[in-house]
Amino acid sequence: MIKVAISGYYGFKNFGDEAILSVLVNHLKTFENADITVFSSDIEYTEKTYGVKAVKRFNLKDVIKTIQNCDVLVSGGGSLLQDVTSLKSLIYYAFIIALGLLFNKKVIIFAQGIGPLNSNIAQNIVKNLLKYCSYVTVRDENSLKLLEKLGVKSELVCDPIYSLDIKSVPQNGVIGVQLREFKTMNFE
């Protein structure tokens, strides 16, 4: 049996993050003996929706116990390692990764968007953690270039959302569009 712990922005019912978790869990379930535990803000929702175990993401005792008992820690997808939202968010996800490394677990950074990393502290945190991870994949060229600049080896993969089984998504005739300003990107 392989025990996998998954860290990300899960249980907040953010469509993009939940879709990424769905793809990741479905892939892991193709391995016959996968025992999956997700760090979530809403344990009941995550367990019911994905058929996995879940622990409260801010329950330090449960998070540490889960990481100590897992074989692999997966961090991702989404854009978890960035300091635009807040440095606190980056520190939380970095702390989870650091625990995995501290307990000598295989740590996989899964299809993340890395950055922007505006502060030197954010750049140093990401650089000094990710270089020790077992496998780092990113979902876009900018993330690949940023990690290359920081001296972190990574691989470019497609965004996991493209693997989502859209047949399982309820069809109600509504299309949603989310507009977001990216101050660090020039689209001209």
Model-derived regions, located:
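Active-site anion-handling motifs in enzyme catalytic cores
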Residues: 1-188
